[in-house]
């Protein structure tokens, strides 16, 4: 399996994992802007009145996956979240959270709630 297919499988696995834990799918691969103003979110889920912006990382170990989320990437995700909330005002009153789902294939998954804050 090449990196492209591993990435798509990891996104699918994260979505199923969160759905089985009571989260509802909102959007995947939300992208806005270009260059330094770009925003990007792998997965957006909802649980109650909380909108969860999820970064998914798949590596050979869960520890390597955790270290792979750089500060620049967190900034892009936060810009993506701000853009999403502006584009979809029906979520304006929701609480916002940034989570990470770490994956070691074939099936080791770790969900980190509140992985970072704005």
Which role does the model predict for each range below?
Residues 24-51:
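Active-site metal-binding core of divalent-cation-utilizing nuclease and nuclease-like domains
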Residues 104-118:
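Short, low-complexity, polybasic intrinsically disordered segments
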Residues 1-30:
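Acidic-basic catalytic patches of nuclease active cores, encompassing PD-(D/E)XK
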Residues 12, 33, 58-106:
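Catalytic cores of nucleic-acid endonucleases
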Residues 26, 65, 108, 112:
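Glycine-rich, flexible loop/turn motifs
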């Amino acid at each position: 399996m090449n990196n492209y297919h591993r990435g798509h499988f990891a996104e699918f696995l994260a979505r199923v994992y969160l759905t089985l834990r009571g989260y509802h799918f909102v959007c995947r691969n939300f992208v806005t802007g270009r260059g330094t103003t770009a925003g990007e979110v792998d997965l957006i889920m909802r649980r109650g009145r909380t909108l969860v912006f999820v970064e998914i990382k798949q590596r050979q170990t869960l520890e390597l996956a955790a270290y792979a989320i750089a500060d620049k990437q967190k900034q892009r995700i936060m810009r993506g979240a701000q853009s999403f909330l502006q584009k979809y005002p029906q979520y304006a009153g929701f609480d916002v959270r940034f989570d990470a789902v770490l994956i070691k294939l074939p099936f080791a998954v770790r969900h980190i709630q509140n992985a970072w804050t704005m």
